[in-house]
Every structure is written in C-alpha cells, then in structure tokens.
Amino acid sequence: YDTVPPAAPYAHDVTIYHAMPHGLCTPLRQKVRAGLYVDVAPVQDQARRALAAHASQKDWLDKSQGMDSYLHTLDKMSAEVGTLSGKYQLAQGWCRHLHLGYSASDIDPLRSALGSDCMVDAVYEAALEKPFP
C-alpha cells in the first residue's frame, strides 16, 4: 500500500483490538461484553478535555445531538463499561481480533503494557471456546 509519508512495511507481530460499539450493543441490539477492561478513571478528565477540544466534532455533535451530549455520552458509557467490568468505576472495553494472519501467536500487548490497570474477563474468554450459535 502507498502511504503518506512513505513507510517501509511493518514485518512484526500485530494485535488488533475492537472497541466496544456505541450503545454497547450489536447492530441487531444484542448486548455485548468486552474481553478486556481498562481502568480509565485516572485519565477520564483528560479524555473529556481532548474530546471537547476537537472543534469540528464538537460543532457537528452539538448541532446534531444537543449541547455537549457527546461529553455526557463519554462519561455514561465509561461508567456502564466500568460496571460491566465488575472492578473499575470507569472503563473502556476491548476485544482482541483472531491473531491468525497478524501474529505468530495469541499475544495480548495491551494487557502486558497496562498490568493491573487492565483486566481480562474470564467468562468472556471461556465463552470463546463454545461454538457460535
């Protein structure tokens, strides 16, 4: 692929994480859980300020959804995901993509990097062993 600026291909293991969907549901309204929860309480204020500073997003969302509703949504969703975690007050949720084609083994660098600020949902992981309904 052509990139700007040009860059050499990255020939190392890669892990892809999927964020929780808006509303914490699939497009068919099925509730979802994360495989991995990250404690965001220590950085929530910083995330809120960064989101508020995104001028074009702020303008469009204020007009389309109401004054600062997206900031309230950030707080509400972080609290809901925190509740789902059973451990954190405020959290983000992530699910790891199947490693085949991206890395030689089933690696989890986010968990390794964050240590105790990250928790794997054992129930979610166990459910992965069951056939898809």
Regions found by a protein language model. Give the residues of each.
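Metal-dependent de-N-acetylase/amidase catalytic core
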Residues: Y1-P133
